[in-house]
Amino acid sequence: MSNETPKKFIPNEQNPMPRWEKKFNKILTPFERFVNRTTTGGLILMMAALIALALANSPLAHHYLHALHVPLGLNLGDWRIEKSLHHWVNDGLMALFFFVVGLELKREMLVGELAEIRKAVLPIVAAIGGMVIPAICYMSLNLNDETFRGWGIPMATDIAFALGVIALLASRVPKALITFLVALAIVDDLGAVVVIAVFYTQDLAWSFLIAGALLTCLLIFFNMIGIRKPSVYFFVGLILWFVFLKSGVHATLAGVITAFTIPAKPKFNTLTFSNRVQDILYKFRKGCEEDESILRNEHLSGLVQTLENGVVGVQTPLQRLEHSFHKPVAFFILPVFAIFNAGVTIDFGNAFQLFNHPITLGVVFGLLFGKFVGITGASWLAIRFGLCSLPNDTSMKHIIGASMLGSIGFTMSIFIAELAFVSQPEMIIQAKLGILLSSLVAGVAGYLWLHKLGGEKSRIGSSL
């Protein structure tokens, strides 16, 4: 995700910062730096998962599990919708996560690594290998009807955790490898969305499904006629979410569909904006009087407002929304999801039997072995047959490290587990145990491999 931190305006000597503001900034600035680090989202998500595990295995476990199922509803006359807090998080908050996933997918397909076929081949092929092989690995250990439905669980890669780990390595990994991992995870997310839509839907209510199709067409129509107000898309998207909730298709898919219809064209082109800004700045300088407050100068206030409107217009709605939602999703929605879903009560006296369950073994086998073999093997074959080439400054050893990090399947894997084993809490627990164990092992292994590799001088393509 492109989330470069905007530069701040620094007061100059003629307009110094007040003393109290300087002191406040000494406290705030380090916090802002922490929030804007690539590693922070992954660290907070990890902390949330550990908190959930600690609560589920503490004397507070009963209260924690009870809180997950507290009912919360909304009444409007005779109309009522009520769900547990757990369901509101998984069906409601996660729709915003899928909205951001959709924005990222659209941007990558328009101007990112997936926009050019030659560049896109490697992450696409790697992602497909990293989805198909893990599913086969899981199926091989779960051939009975009860557990077979979990085949989609090990297909997912958690981009927040993976990037958090790779960011800890700083300059030890080439930038092209990070780009490859991001593109792979985005294709992986698209695959997970398709799997959820096709294979993890309940009995379909066709009247609501038709209504959803009509609302989707309406969103596309809004895009085609040039409506740029995000509020219009959010309003229709909210109705689409409710319709999907009633249709049997998972409601979070409304987030992806809405994101794909968000306009990706700016109101003004960059040349028009540049010329207009020069004109506004000229008028602003001309209208400035020393030490005059802008509150008293309506002309200057008007120019600033015009400039602000221009800044909004030269950006695409897609850019603005992706930037606006990145931090709420990374620092609130995903940690809340982890707290509500990662809490697994472990009977340590019976640990061997817990981890010896076919679901747990299937998830571990799929994530740790299937992802590694799928991503590495598919990448090697694609390069070997001349379909693509390695990213700049990378070798197959780097791809091996990326495939280890690709085995971290936390968020989306848990989400699919909840869908695969609805009303079967024991099976969900088994799946979560496998996900947590695999993610821990994959994260540590990937870090150690790439850390060691960063200390060596690898030759590009030496392992081909």
UniProtKB/Swiss-Prot annotation:
Subcellular location, principal: membrane
GO biological process: regulation of pH
GO molecular function: sodium:proton antiporter activity
The keyword Membrane is assigned to this record: yes
Keywords from the UniProt entry: Antiport, Cell inner membrane, Cell membrane, Ion transport, Membrane, Sodium, Sodium transport, Transmembrane, Transmembrane helix, Transport
A Pfam match: Na_H_antiport_1
Function summary: Na(+)/H(+) antiporter that extrudes sodium in exchange for external protons.
HAMAP family the record matches: NhaA (MF_01844)
Protein name, as recorded: Na(+)/H(+) antiporter NhaA 1
Organism, scientific name: Saccharophagus degradans (strain 2-40 / ATCC 43961 / DSM 17024)
Lineage: Bacteria, Pseudomonadati, Pseudomonadota, Gammaproteobacteria, Cellvibrionales
Name of the coding gene: nhaA1
